[in-house]
Amino acid sequence: QKAKEEVSKRRKTNLGKTKLNPSVGTVIVKNNTVISSGKTSLNGRPHAEYNALKKNNNYKGANLYTTLEPCTHFGLTPPCVNIIEKKKIKNVFYAFEDPDTRTFKKAKKILNKKKIISKLIKCKNYKSFYDSYFYNKKFNLPFVSAKIAISKDFYSINRRSKWITNKQSKKVVHLLRSKNDCIFSTSKSINIDNSLLNCRLNGLDNFKPDLFII
């Protein structure tokens, strides 16, 4: 349970900030103790498994828990299954199969051939986390989040009030901005609101999506 909680924390940290790669969390457990952890780096490289295993620890016989099936293909870096074998990991557990056709259902076969037990452990409460990644891989389209604020009388603005959202909804919007690559807005909306359309949350203010004005 502790490993699941730790891996869940790691996967969330860089959500929306790993470019084309999904945000993944990985923890290494040996003798019932978490000895290392990793997450996908900003811009997507290195992967979480590599970041967890690059530290100078004795990983022989350890269990690796990760949120997504380890990659099996060569890209800008070697596949994660290679370093898993090199570090002599005993068991690999992952929450979802990677829909990327270069990896889909291949990690288990490769690792099992190397006598590394690999198991898919489905975690339903993680599923929505990868909605954007799964959607992109399935339809080859970007995942779109819509922000709409409407008053009780079904108007978005009136002459008396400039904003109809509250502090909590504004925080949610800023968080969405930090997780998305770009924002589409109309020139009318920007001119009326004088919108900055950036993220103004502490620690996330460096993550500003590209702006496209319609």
Tell me the role of every PLM-derived stretch.
Residues Q1-K17, N31, K60, F74-I214:
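Zinc-dependent deaminase
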Residues K17-V27, G61-A62:
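Acidic, glycine-enriched active-site microenvironments
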Residues K19-N21, H47, N206:
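A generic fold-level signal
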Residues P22-V24, I35, V144-A146:
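Short loop/turn microsegments at loop-to-beta-strand junctions
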Residues V24, K39, P46-H47, L64-I83:
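Local cysteine-cluster metal-coordination motifs and their immediate loop/turn environment
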Residues G25-V27, G38-K39, E69, A149, ...:
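Anionic group-transfer/hydrolysis microenvironments
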Residues T26-K30, V34-K54, K122:
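N-terminal beta-alpha supersecondary unit
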Residues N56-N58:
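Glycine-rich helix-loop-beta junction characteristic of Rossmann-like nucleotide cofactor-binding loops
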